[in-house]
Structures are given as C-alpha cells and as structure tokens.
C-alpha cells in the first residue's frame, strides 16, 4: 500500500523525505513503475511509495525529474545527508540490484547478462505493438505483436528467461505481458494458434511468483483506468 495512496498533483506539497528510507515515485497503473516494484518485492527491500498524477504533475516532482516520468528513486545519502534521485525503470532496477546483495537478479556471467539486455532493449517492439492495439490500430498491432513475440518464444530454454527462477529479465518483460488480457476486446488472444507454448508456460509460472502477486493491480481496476486512458482522460484514483 502506498504511503500516500492518492496520486499527488499540481499544487500538492512534496512529503518530507526521511533519512534511512527509500522512496519510489510511482503511478498505480504504470508498467514501467511496476518493473521497479517487482525488483523491490523480489529482493524484499522496504520502501515508501508516492504516486504521481502523470497528467497534472506536481511542480516539485518536475524539479526533481524534468520529464516527469515514473519510476523515480530517491533517498538521503548516509554520508553527505543530501538527497539522491535516479529516474528510468531499467536504471532504477539495476541500481536496486547492485546495491542490495541479497537475491541478485542479474546474471554474473557477462555474456549471459549481455544476451538478456539485448532482449530487454528490443522489447520496445512488444510495447509499441501493445500500445498500437490499445490506441486504436488493432489489426496492425496484433500482427506486429505476434511477429515480435517469436524471438522471445525461441529464447526461452527453461522455466524462466533467467533459468529455474526469475531473473531481472523476467521482471523487466512481465508488466506488459500481465496486461495482455486487456487486449482481448481489440482482437488479440495470446497463443490462440498454439505457437507460443513456452511463453504460455512462462506466463503461468510468473503468475505464481510471489513478487508478481505482491504488486499486481486487480485486472478490473486496470480496465477502468484503461477506459479513460484510451479516451485521453485517465483517472488515477478509484474509491
């Protein structure tokens, strides 16, 4: 549960940052923020969550992060007592993994780590197709999504991309896959032709993962958000 459940917006005040407390700036429905939350959950790192209204962004947050995107990670440095801030989901996730030695998520082998990073970097082909479907071009988007899923089906050689248990790559890919059921009304049914059996098994394994379950937002709530998002009027807070 976020420390401030409501999404803060223009005119709000930045909650005071406490020493020895890690803060994540987030948005309840943002898949990029979910990446960081999955890493935090997988590594059992305590943190404070502050949700940001991404349409009506607080002035104080724009001073910390000019693009106004989430996630953002902030803390008070133990030695200098100055606040530190890191943006971008991949950078935040890598930092969390490198600074918390328990349950390391990145491979120790440099070549395997590079292979994983290639798949993560090329994942934009999946996210682009996903949003193409969501924003009203379902026919081309569905074709693109099915085409761009093939390399990921071929890359799976174990239960997870990381092997017998999830690694960083699994958590970085997951948020959009979790949202695939939202595309059914637009005509996309994952694995309807049976061409992605390994990815289908991976999805089942990920859904059973403790970190995934811990940060998942109920599908019905996400559907409500996406209805407003598609109309250009996203609603962030639901009673």
Report the location of each language-model feature:
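Acidic/histidine-enriched, glycine/proline-rich intrinsically disordered or flexible terminal extensions
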Residues: 219-239
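GST-like domain detector, emphasizing the conserved glutathione-binding G-site
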Residues: 1-161, 233
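Short catalytic/ligand-binding loop motif for oxyanion handling, primarily in non-cytosolic enzymes
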Residues: 88, 182, 224
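A short hydrophobic/aromatic micro-motif that marks alpha-helical segments and, especially, helix-coil
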Residues: 103, 127, 185, 224-225
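GST-like fold's C-terminal all-alpha helical module
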Residues: 111, 118-217
């Amino acid at each position: 549960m976020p420390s401030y459940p409501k999404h803060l917006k223009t005119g709000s005040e930045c909650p005071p940052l406490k020493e020895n407390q890690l803060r994540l700036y987030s948005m309840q429905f943002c898949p990029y923020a979910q990446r960081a939350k999955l890493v935090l959950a997988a590594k059992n790192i305590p943190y404070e969550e502050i949700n940001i209204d991404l349409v009506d962004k607080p002035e104080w947050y724009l001073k910390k992060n000019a693009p106004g995107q989430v996630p953002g990670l902030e803390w008070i440095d133990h030695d200098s007592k100055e606040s530190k801030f890191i943006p971008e989901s991949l950078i935040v996730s890598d930092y969390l993994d490198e600074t918390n030695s328990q349950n390391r998520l990145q491979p120790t082998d440099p070549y395997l780590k590079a292979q994983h990073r290639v798949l993560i970097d090329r994942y934009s082909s999946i996210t682009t197709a996903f949003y193409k479907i969501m924003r009203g071009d379902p026919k081309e988007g569905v074709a693109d999504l099915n085409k761009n899923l093939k390399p990921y089906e071929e890359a799976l050689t174990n239960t997870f991309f990381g092997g017998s248990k999830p690694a960083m790559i699994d958590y970085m890919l997951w948020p959009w896959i979790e949202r695939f059921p939202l595309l059914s009304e637009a005509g996309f049914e994952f694995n309807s032709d049976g061409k992605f059996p390994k990815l289908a098994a991976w999805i089942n394994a990920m859904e059973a993962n403790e970190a995934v379950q811990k940060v998942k937002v109920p599908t019905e709530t996400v559907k409500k958000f996406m209805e407003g998002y598609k109309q250009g009027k996203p609603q962030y807070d639901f009673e």
